Amino acid sequence: MSALLSADDLNDFISPGIACIKPTVTENRSQEALEYGEVEIQIDENGKPLEISKIDGATKNLSPAQISLADCLACSGCITSAEEILVAQHSHNELIKALKEKKTNNKIFVASISHQARASLATAYDMKVSDIDRLLVDLLVNQMGFTYVVGTGLGRKLSLINELQSIIERKEHGFQGPILSSICPGWVLYAEKTHPHVLLRISDTKSPQQITGCLLKSLTAHQLEVERDQIYHLSIMPCFDKKLESARPEQDPLLVLNDVDCVLTPKELVTLLDECKDKFSLTFDALSHSSGSLTDLYQSCAPANWPYVELSWSSDSGSLSGGYGYNYLQLLQLHLCLRDPQQYQPQNFRLESVAGRNKDIYELRLVYNDNQVASSAIVNGFRNIQNLVRKLKPTSSTTTTKTNPLVARRKARLSSKRSESGAQDVQQADASKCDYVEIMACPNGCINGGGQINLPTDEDQKLWVSKTLTRYGSIPMVDLSSDSSLTLELMAWCREFCINYNVPESRLLKTWFHEVEQPTDQAAILVGSKW
């Protein structure tokens, strides 16, 4: 493992398999190769593979196999991340290499920055998020030569709106049981590779990273009159699995190019600065020379045709992962009040919270006049995810479930004690019975992503996390549910964008999933049972 990226850092990391199960690609062989006839593979004295002809003994060097991020998505040998692949193809070294090639290939560099990454960097440098925003813009635009820099807030809000619309549509068509979020790539890959029975439950709404990428490349290409493949998009995210998400292939035949070319985490950005001190730095002098307002700063580094610039840097209420569970209920309340104002009045709604077995699982219930209208749950960490997936696993109607007699006696004993003491059963969150579940692989959610900056050796863990949470909470909030006109405006702008820039709504907002076939090579079957 590299010093930068280790198993301890990634909450959702599992070591690669002993044998990679990627199938060998058969290339069209030339006439010269065909004349080789039957061959065998041997290792020479230097450990290099050779192809030896059985006809005349002629030898030929073999090229090393190349594994890409796309191969990782199509492989079930590792549950989520293969660290070597992530570092090789989405690293700070790759970004530096791309910047060096800029003079010859005339690439246009653009960047987007997540809220969690901004909070992590602000904590590490002990400053306000607004100040770290100024330093990041200075670093990317003035020092590295990026043309545009935006926040991911606009992409997130479009994602939240589309999530609500998707849930309403599926429920109106009779969908039973919980719909599961797809914003976390670690969770999605886990489901695709080990629990395909839940794929039909997973929402097809794209994440803020991917929506922002599509918007940024399309608007930049139009404004600068260049092709999309001339644009290099860097996304700064809190999680290493976001690198794999960026490599997920698109289904639209006209827009197959990836919307994100490189994903770096705050941890990797700091490493880049340490290794390139003579070229790049978060120059604190930039703060003293930056006298304009934040609004002016955000406007200056965004494309001229980028809408709602300040919105891109604003946050949302709810969890530290984007507030999907909370905003589903709040936007649903807004939807009901707009659709049927005679039946639903805002003042009669309330939101109830129900705790789970631990701090990483809880339930939210939307109640109207003491009647539950809808519910959502927040589930963080793979232990809680496993428990949820087990509950959602379909059971055969012909199979009878045997009850463990010891468990039955224990339950009866506890029930008897409660009855004797007059105690009432305490409600506990049950995500499997909710309408919608926000799922994140990392404990505490995205704010605790594996790519966030580690605490100093002399710092208390709880205090460090608390500082990061405080900085995340300091980002200005713009709640969609508090302004119905804003939500309607964003929906209208999204439709106009898709028409004006010839981008299908499904390409902008929707993703897709598929079951990854299990390996048949026994040497490659090793990690699934550990989850």
Give the residues covered by each predicted segment:
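Iron-sulfur-associated redox domains of electron-transfer enzymes in respiratory
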Residues: 2-531
